Structure formats: C-alpha cells, structure tokens
Amino acid sequence: MTIPDVPTQTLPDEGEIGFVHIGSLTTEAGAVIDDVHIAVQRWGELSPTRDNVVVVLHALTGDSHVTGPAGPGHPTGGWWDEMVGPGAPIDTDRWCAVATNVLGGCRGSTGPSSRTRDGKPWGSRFPRISIRDQVEADIAALAALGIDEVAAVVGGSMGGARALEWIVGHPSRVRAGLLLAVGARATADQIGTQCTQIAAIKSDPNWQGGDYHDTGRTPDAGLAIARRFAHLTYRGEVELDTRFGNDAQLDEDPANGGRYAVQSYLEYQGVKLVERFDAGSYVVLTEALNSHDVGRARGGVRKALRSCPVPVVVGGITSDRLYPLRLQQELAEQLPGCAELQVVDSICGHDGFLVESEAVGEMIRKTLLLAGSQSAGPGGAGPGSRKGTTRR
C-alpha cells in the first residue's frame, strides 16, 4: 500500500470536525483513490510530546462523533458518550481522544457519495477497500497531523477489526489496544448475513448500479431492509423475546395484515438509518467487513496473531451472535500481549459493546494502563515503558 508524503496539518478544535487531506491512496488490491480526505474529531489536548493520543474507532454505521450532542454535520449525538470526557474512561484531562470517519464512509471522509475531480460522485467507481486500507488511511491522516505513534487504539465490531489491523500491521505505532466484540477474520455466518444485506440494497431498482447520487432516486427501501436484517444480528435473542415476544404492534392485528411489535421495531431501525446513512457506503464498508482477515498475506491467522507483541485487552459479550465469544477467546489465546479476556454477561447481544457502559469503561481503563504512558496530559513528560502483561 502506497501513501505519498503530505504536509503536516492541524488538529481541529475540541469537538469540531476537521478534514485531513492525505493525497492519493493505493489500496491493498492496487486501486488508486485520488484526493482522499479523512474527517477527524478530537477531545482533550495533545501533549507537547504527542504521546497521549487514544484513537477511537467506530463500527459500521458510526462516525467520528464519539461524544457530544447532535448538530451541524452530526445528525445524531455521540455514539459512545460515556466513554470520552473529563473523568471518563478516556479521561480528556489526561488523554487526547481522536476519532476519524472511516475511509469509504459518508460523514466527511472520502467514499462513494464524495465528488471526484470531475465533479461527479464516485458512485460505482469507488473501489473495493479492506479493513487494512481503512487503517492505512487513518495512519496517513494522523501522520499528516504530526502524530506517528499513539498510546492506544480502542474499538468494537468493525472498529475492533480496525484496532486489530493497527496492532498487527503497525505494532511500533501503538502501545496498547482494546479489541472488543470482534474476531481475527470474517466467519461464514458473518459473510452470509452481510452478503444478504448487500443483495437487499442492490435489488432496489433505485440502486441504479450504484450511480444513484445525482438522480433524485435513492435505494432507501433496500437500505432499510438491510438494516432490519443487520439489527437482528446486533441484538440478543433473549433480549428481543423478552421485549417483544410474539406480541402484536399496538392497535394492529397480524392475523388481519397488521404487524408484530418486533416487526415495527425493526422497520423503525431501518427508517432511522436511511435518514442518516448512504447506501453506497453501507455496501463498501460491508464488503470490507466480509474481507476482514488479519492473516491474509501474513502466513495465516495464527502466525499473524502470534507475531504481534502489543499489549491488549480483549472483550466479548455472552449473547453476541454476530461475533460469538469463541472468536474473542481465539484472540486472547493467540495474542502474546493479551493481558486479559473480559467477558460481559449481557442479554443485549453484539450491541452490548455500545450499551454496557460500566463493563466497557473498565476495559478501556485497563487498556490505558497497559499503554504505560506516564504523561499527565498536555504538560506531561512523555511515555514510560510498556507494562508487563500476563496471559489469561
């Protein structure tokens, strides 16, 4: 992967969104994406020695807006509000939290809805990308900001896949990591469910081969169906049955064409996503998840994991049916730097990494202890040595 040198740029003001130009990016597969911009936000001050950066990596339909209210450029409030801020697990009195919108996304970073130099949206011309490409773009953006090494990378789901690629592909650039609700590679079950979501979008007549952006017709129905199916994999089976059972939606009768309560709930989730997300980005990012394999071109998963020295905390959720606990157990067993496998007992399924704030906050705090930084924040004196870890 080739990323040309670019001039150093400046971090945006706290909580504001900035756009870092990284030039052209050559993907793992050899495609060239010209004129790439990566959206960046930060909370907390960068220390003089630039040693206190914690990179927060979002999941599939997330963005750089980790914390804070909705506003211009942010159609929703922060997706991990309780994790970042003064006194929070990522304590911004000490750490500088930095988040990007992933390459291929639709919240400020270059993706299918972005316009190319010819003034037209990328659309179907946007190439397939991998999780590895996303990480390379993030690293290039940070380098343009003068940040060559980070204290930690933390992320769940697709963010966890990005964190894993960070530590395996660039162990000298990161001092610790939190790998949450993720595995070393995509499983057949994940690929199957995710390919079905892509098919739902592409079967919408308004998809138009991916070149719909300037036509006034968007594949909203296909995207909503994809989200409904995906949302089932995000929540726990027991949780859904406890909340909805086989109940009818209020004032409706399924026997007479009405809806079930769970059906109404899933339709609502689909509508919410359509209001804030681009179908082309959903396809591109889902394809990247399908191709996730940390062992690709590294001698296989086992060799790739066992060669990674970075201290990590691995977190899993008992009811996660998208990334079952066995996948986190594999990471914990194969990563030499794994200090702890933390298992969250939750009925909330995969989304437990977003809603089980107390347990996730504890994992983040332990990860930052592993980072070994003795920086006191903006006036700190620089990092200490990495702390020793024990295998679980």
Curated annotation (Swiss-Prot):
Molecular function (Gene Ontology), one example: homoserine O-acetyltransferase activity
Gene3D superfamilies: alpha/beta hydrolase
Region (Disordered): 373-392
Catalyzed reactions per annotation: L-homoserine + acetyl-CoA = O-acetyl-L-homoserine + CoA
EC primary class: transferase
InterPro entries attached to this UniProt entry: AB_hydrolase_1, AB_hydrolase_fold, HAT_MetX-like
Entry superkingdom: Bacteria
Active site: S157 (nucleophile), D320, H350
Signal sequence coordinates: none
Record-listed substrate binding positions: R227, D351
Location of the AB hydrolase-1 domain: 52-356
EC number: 2.3.1.31
Intracellular or extracellular location(s): Cytoplasm
Subunit structure, as described in the record: Homodimer.
Its biological purpose: Transfers an acetyl group from acetyl-CoA to L-homoserine, forming acetyl-L-homoserine.
Family the UniProt entry places it in: Belongs to the AB hydrolase superfamily. MetX family.
Identification of the protein by name: Homoserine O-acetyltransferase
Originating organism: Mycobacterium avium (strain 104)
Lineage: Bacteria, Bacillati, Actinomycetota, Actinomycetes, Mycobacteriales
Gene encoding the protein: metXA
